[in-house]
Design a protein with these regions (language model features):
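Bacterial N-terminal signal peptides that target proteins for export
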Residues: 1-11
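Bacterial N-terminal signal peptides
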Residues: 9-19
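Lumenal/extracellular ectodomains and adaptor appendage modules
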Residues: 24-337
Length: 337
């Protein structure tokens, strides 16, 4: 849900505010290496919303989403209006992981775990839920986990561990994997240049959910967001104009953000996109409600569907717009020049 045009000019500021991520891919430094296309040093990805099977007596009583800079919590309330328990399938899709072709983007993951890189936890009525991982490492549409593991490559297709492993590939192994579409081909003109992972890692966590009769069961899904972090400084006023519609910036807020930049101030920006899909296509449900925690009182929060009356409070409230399957939430923190 990122805005490529906006992010293009952000990175030219040259300020990277994010701490070193657990797992990341970055462009290697070097005086003779041309600058990568301008993109944020740390980009965002969306974790899928919970999806659940249907049953005649299953009602979605509500969905609440709580957002903090380091944690997102979805609370689903499922009511079984019947006299017998329901047993339905449920799943959460984790974000697709794929290397940046030009090494210009990086993603901060909560854990170096290919089956759960976002630290996902799920509870039902307060009891931890055990999920099963459906994992695919797809190259040219074919699951190549066997070939990847045979060459001792990690499944996460970027990061320091991956870079070290592909650098250790023999020329024959690299050529064999390239022929399968698993890694990039070697460049004969630059035989020492490292190859890159060319597969995507797709993970779905699934389970069977039992819902007792006549009760409402809360299911809580919690994880660490894969967020973008960057800076805005003097000269970036037009970039705020470019993003105003996507996050529904009001004129007075836009003016305040731009005024700081005109006065040689800066903004540290945390940019998070969340899924706002309803849990079932076949069960009516109201739109998810949103609450966004401000890490500090002087920060500005912006997103479409925000309740403007809560903008100055420690917790900003709102609801996902009717036509949105994702909501982009941006938190602006005042920063020195």
């Amino acid at each position: 849900m990122s805005n490529p045009g906006f992010l293009l000019s952000i990175a030219s500021v040259g300020l990277v505010l994010a701490a070193t991520p657990v797992m990341a891919q970055t462009k290697p430094a070097g005086a003779d290496v041309p600058a990568a296309p301008s993109t944020p040093a740390q980009s965002s990805l969306v974790v899928g919303a919970l999806q659940i099977g249907s049953a005649p007596n299953l009602v979605v009583a509500g969905v609440d989403i709580s957002v903090a800079s380091d944690s997102i919590v979805y609370s689903y309330f499922f009511k079984n209006t019947g006299s017998a328990e329901l047993d339905v399938a449920a799943s959460v899709s984790l974000p697709e992981l794929q290397a940046s072709a030009d090494r210009s983007e990086t993603w901060a993951l909560a854990a170096n775990d290919p089956e759960n890189p976002v630290g996902l936890t799920i509870t039902a009525a307060g009891t931890p839920v055990t999920t099963q991982a459906e994992v695919h490492a797809n190259a040219l549409g074919i699951d190549r986990r066997t070939e990847i593991k045979a060459e001792h490559l990690p499944l996460i297709p970027f990061g320091a561990e991956l870079d070290k492993a592909v650098a250790a590939l023999s020329p024959d192994a690299a050529d064999r994997l390239a022929a399968l579409g698993v890694v990039s081909p070697r460049d004969p003109a630059q035989p020492k240049a490292p190859v890159m992972a060319d597969w995507s890692l797709d993970v779905v966590r699934s389970w069977r959910q039992v819902l007792p009769p006549g009760k409402t069961t809360p299911i809580v899904v919690k994880f660490s967001p894969v967020k973008a972090q960057y800076a805005l400084a003097k000269g970036d006023q037009e970039d705020l104009d470019d993003m105003k519609d996507e996050i529904c910036l009001k004129p007075v807020v836009l003016s305040a953000l731009q005024s700081r930049l005109k006065g040689s101030g800066a903004w540290k920006v945390t940019d998070i996109s969340i899924a706002a899909d309803l849990p079932s296509h076949w069960i009516d449900s109201s739109r998810p409600t949103l609450s966004v925690q401000k890490p500090k009182p002087d920060m500005i929060v912006a997103f479409c569907g925000m309740d403007e009356k809560t903008a100055s409070r420690p917790t900003v409230l709102g609801a996902a717009p009717d036509d949105a399957d994702e909501v982009r939430i941006v938190i602006f923190e005042p920063a020195a020049k």
